[in-house]
Amino acid sequence: MYSWNTIRTFCAILLLIPVVHLVYLVSQDVTASLEPSPEAWSEEIAAYAAADQSARLPVKPVVVIGGRQVKLWQGLEDLLSPRPVLMRGLGDATVDDMTHYHSELIGHYQPGILVLLPGTSEFHIRDSKSAEELVTAIRKLVKLDESYDVPRQYYIFAPIKTPRYSQDYSKIDETMRLLAQWAQGEPNVTILDPNTLLTSRGGRPNPDYFRLDGVNLNEHGYLRISLLLQNTLDQNLNEEYASIGIR
């Protein structure tokens, strides 16, 4: 029989594992964030390539790209099943970084659906973009992808408002407005606003949906944006079927 102190210590270690993992990810990302070149993420790109060599890649998957918020996003694969899903997050990477690695993150997988979740890094440290600059970067990424004449649908999240960075709220509101305006002329682009599902009655981000760092979503927050994506995908598919007479 194990002593009570031994059992308590073991349980404490189990509880600390997720925290240690997050601290490890953050420390890696902070170091990389100080490097302005997209090469800061070359090791993560190489790790994905190595994993792909021993995997059977799905046909026309849903590919989700972004920064740390994508790396920490769990459960989407099960929720969107039987659609195959590949999560391809890169530390605190920006949209410009993802454009740089287009071949590795998008072209290699030939997705039927591309999902983009921009992170807070767009407005801090490496970039400090304005809303207009972020939307321009997103449009550049989509235009590059479309230049290969491979038909696919694009689902683009507006950046998530976080409890920690209240100074970003006006930029995010303007980003959402500009994205919605642009998407009106882009039939293959759908804009998703996660903030309507993550705020309290006062319109500020609800801490119940975020980790203690005030930046990254917890499991409750991720469930809400996962359901938003799932419902939007299903709705668009039903509309497509209806347009060709399938019910």
Enumerate the predicted regions with their spans.
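Catalytic His-Asp segment of secreted/periplasmic serine-dependent ester chemistry enzymes
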Residues: 163-247
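Structural motif
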Residues: 61, 113-115, 153
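Conserved beta-strand segments of alpha/beta enzyme cores
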Residues: 84-86, 153, 188-190
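N-terminal secretory targeting modules
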Residues: 1-61, 236-247
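Charged helix-capping and loop-helix junction motifs
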Residues: 130-140, 171-176
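Active-site segments of SGNH/GDSL-like serine hydrolases
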Residues: 117-123, 145-174, 195-201
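Oxyanion-hole/transition-state-stabilizing segment in secreted/luminal serine hydrolases
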Residues: 70-79, 84, 97-135, 159-163
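Catalytic nucleophile-elbow at a beta strand-turn-alpha helix junction centered on a G-D-S/GDSL motif
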Residues: 54, 59-75, 91-93
